Amino acid sequence: MPALGSAENPLRVAIVGSGPAGFYSAEHLMKREDLSVNVDMFDRLPTPFGLVRAGVAPDHPKIKSVIRMYEKTAARDGFQFFGNVEVGRDVHADELDARYHAVIYAYGTATDRQLGIPGEDLPGSHAATTFVNWYNAHPDFADYDFDLSHRRAVVVGNGNVAADVARMVALPRAELETTDTADHAIEALASSGVEEIVVLGRRGPAQAAFTNPEVRELGELTEADIVIDPAEMELDDASRAYLESDDCDPTSRRNVEIFTEFSSREPEGKRKRVVLRFCASPVEIKGDGKVESIVIGRNELYEDGAGAIRARDTGEREELECGLVLRSIGYKGIGLDGVPFDSGRGLIPNEAGRVTELESGEHLPGHYAVGWIKRGPSGVIGTNKKDALDTVNSIFADLEAGTMPELREPSANPETPGREAPDGADTVSVTIEELLAKRGADHITYLGWQAIDAAEVTAGEPHGRPRIKFCRIDEMVEASRAAEAV
């Protein structure tokens, strides 16, 4: 048999997930001129690009321009996209093992971390990711209903997602209507009764995880004042020492400078206001059948034995009336049947991207992880490029060492995922396309996605918008089929 990776015997790789980590992995794999690689990319949505489409704020179109790089990868010979295909529903992990030399799991962290406080499950208390998906037209969240009638909303968290949702609630209709915000969200946000958005940070200004541009934007809102009580900027000794040290992250130092400038501003009397609070943690959400208030505990900072600056409760309490609570305190992944998973950390266990058995720590040949499901929800979009290179280098090393597994015989019945094939079933000859067709999976090709894309852009043009997004899977499938029929 010709060498694996030759033109006669290309390396076959499946990538589960089509966000930045998945596309960077595909690009690193396919750009090697001395290696022949075929990549099949799977996503449970009909649309690719993951959080670039469904997570980046609609008023940040420049960030979304990275999609042009992914489009070049998708245009490479040997690349195929299988949208609207869910691993575990339409195809089992074992069936991917049978058809690919390597499977890269790049499906991100889909669930949010809980606050773990009383009242967290009251109507009106939501994960910030749910809110983000809702205004970004994610089809799973199109029918969500957010109560925006109360004058105050509270956002829990001090990272960029918290800044995004606070800013989106503060934007006026005229600005929303120049973006690709979902139509249903534009109407709800533009007509909301929210006048004040309070953003709570567990630790102090020096520990806030915002990037500098996100912080600056909060001070540039056309119809919302930015408010920080000067008392919030009274730093503890440990934070001052950190800011003055050579170890200080320049982002943290600049954030504190921006916060200090905000705290000196006099409110201009704009229609709304965004209030940043530090050393404040929610301890209870109250209400009779819905969110009516939130109890906030005051924290103090201390330096632990390892030199880390941590927060502890002082026992001081404050109650704020509100009608909406959005928590943005981190994310975790969910497991796939047949793939090792560390439920405590919410990650696929791995070493340098090689998936490992949870108990023994042994490498699982042919299985790899990349992105947030590999390392946790950290970094920006570009962080995934280096992360993907590390994982792909592990694949190359395994290929050169001869430890890449051969293609295995499929073990599942084409009619039903996860069931043993009947005796004598000729499942070896069933390609992934045939398998999906037998299951009735209505998969979307990259050509189909391009038709969806074109339809959205065309719909937005008369309104001066970059696109009007479909928010229903059946609408996406219909748009894709119109092109594939030509």
Regions found by a protein language model. Give the residues of each.
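Glycine-rich dinucleotide-binding loop and its adjacent helix/turn
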Residues: 112-191, 348-357
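C-terminal, flexible cofactor-proximal segment of oxidoreductases
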Residues: 354-486
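N-terminal Rossmann-like FAD-binding beta1-loop-alpha1 element of flavoenzymes
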Residues: 13-35, 163-169
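FAD-site-proximal beta/loop scaffold in flavoenzymes
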Residues: 124-142, 285, 290, 302-375
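Feature captures the FAD/FMN-dependent oxidoreductase FAD-binding
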Residues: 69-124, 283-295
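N-terminal Rossmann-like dinucleotide/flavin-binding domain of flavoprotein oxidoreductases
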Residues: 38, 46-102, 251, 256-270, ...
